[in-house]
């Protein structure tokens, strides 16, 4: 019984020691594995950077190859023949109005001993900073003309710059393509310069006409409005007419009055007239009536003396 506690204590001391001894190598292995993983993660970006550098180094030769190819393409373009000479003349000067015809003449001189076959004539607008970039390519003019040695030929060409190109510079390239009897192809850049397309000033377009019509209508509307405003201020109130009646009896229409009423009105007027005459008639005495009767009985005087005697008689009667 005394050994049991000692064995138990020994077991408790020996078991942790055994566990520690077994876990020691494993733990160190795990730590070593973690360290190796970290080293691998550090080494991976280095490897990726090396790959990128290799790709850049690989791209550089390709870019150089492309530039060389472009130079070869440019150098492979046909050039002008030393046995030929070209000249150009713009008919209306070196002005290039937008949306208007530009015409020029190209002269070709054969200075060699063999015939030249002039095939075509073309023109194009290009970007001023890069002549390989086309802005507007015009139609090539087929010629197919044989120019004998020591002879000249003149060709006419015309084109119309687009209207949106007005006011901007462009590179104008005019090429004359020809070949000899052996099949050698030549190309002469007759004109290769930067020009400015000018805006068209002459003439009236639809937008300008519409703008002028709109402004004219607006001005007319303003004038009419001001006129109406002034008239409304000057306008006076209308004068009310007062009925004054008829000024004379002739203006009255009696046809609608019955005839009986008219007779009564006429009879009343006659009575009123008689009464008025009686009121205004002077009072004459009987002697005056007698003198008047005497005057009627007197003979008509023929001379001045007779008139005088008649007046004396009347004076005797008391008139």
Swiss-Prot record:
Q: Provide the primary localization.
A: endoplasmic reticulum
Q: Which residues lie on this side of the membrane: Cytoplasmic?
A: 230-319
Q: Which cellular component terms (GO) are annotated to the entry?
A: endoplasmic reticulum; endoplasmic reticulum membrane
Classify the protein's membrane topology as the record does.
Answer: Single-pass type I membrane protein
Q: Which residues carry this modification: Phosphoserine?
A: 248
Chain ranges on the Lumenal side, renumbered to this chain:
22-208
Bilayer-crossing regions: 209-229
Complex formation: Heterotetramer of TRAP-alpha, TRAP-beta, TRAP-delta and TRAP-gamma. Interacts with palmitoylated calnexin (CALX), the interaction is required for efficient folding of glycosylated proteins.
Query: What is the annotated role of this protein in its UniProt record?
Result: TRAP proteins are part of a complex whose function is to bind calcium to the ER membrane and thereby regulate the retention of ER resident proteins. May be involved in the recycling of the translocation apparatus after completion of the translocation process or may function as a membrane-bound chaperone facilitating folding of translocated proteins.
Protein name, as recorded: Translocon-associated protein subunit alpha
Q: What species was this sequence derived from?
A: Rattus norvegicus (Rat)
